[in-house]
Amino acid sequence: MTRAEPPIVNDRFAPRLALFYAAFFVMSGLHMMAFPVWLSAKGLDVAAIGIVLATPQFLRLIAIPVGTRLADRRGALNGPLAATALATAAGMVLVAFADGFTAILAAVVIVALVSAPVLPLSDAYALKGLAARGLSYGPVRLWGSVAFIAANLAGGLMLSTLAPVHLIWPIVATYAAMAVTTLMLVRLPATPRTPTERSHGH
C-alpha cells in the first residue's frame, strides 16, 4: 500500500516565482539597453563593443548544456539556480571595476559562463513546482514580459539623466536583485535518480 503524497499548502510559490521572473527581465532589459552605452563610455570602439556583446552568445552554447546537465545529475534545482545567480551578480561587479578591452572582455566571459544556466534552470524549476501545485506557467511568466517592457521605459529615462560611465551600477543592482530573489524561492524536493541513471552517470 503506497503512502499518499501530502497536499501542498499555499506556500506562495507562484508569487515568489513571478518576482524572480520580474527581476530577471528587468535585469535583461536594462542590460540590453544600457550596457553598450557604458562600454562606449569606457572607451571601447564599435568593433570592440561588438566582440564584447557577441562573445557571451557563443559561450552560452557550451555553458547552458553543461550547467543544466550538472544540475540534472544532482536532481536538485534550488541550489544550482541560486549558485549561478549569485555568481552572475558577483561577476558583474568584476565587470564594473574592469578597465580596458581585455579586462572587460575577461569579466564578461566569466559572467556569460556562470549566467547561461540561470534561465533554463529557473524554467525547469517553474514547470516542476507549478505542475505539482496544479498552476499554469503563463500567468507567472507574464510578469517577466511586463517587467522587461518597464525596464526599457525606465532605461530610456536613465540614459537621459545618468552619466554613461555610471550606468554600470544600476545594471549591477538589477543583477543583485535577481540573485536575491532566487534565495526567496520555495525549495523543491530533489528528484531522485534511478539506479540506471546513477550507474551510467547521467
What spans do the regions from the language model cover?
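Juxtamembrane intracellular "pre-TM" segments in multi-pass secondary transporters
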Residues: 2-12, 185-202
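Structural signature of the two symmetry-related core transmembrane helices
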Residues: 79-94, 172
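Helix-loop junctions at membrane interfaces in 12-TM secondary transporters
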Residues: 14, 96-108
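Symmetry-related core transmembrane helices of the 12-TM Major Facilitator Superfamily/SLC fold
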Residues: 151, 166-184
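Helix-loop boundary and gating motifs at the non-cytosolic
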Residues: 5-57
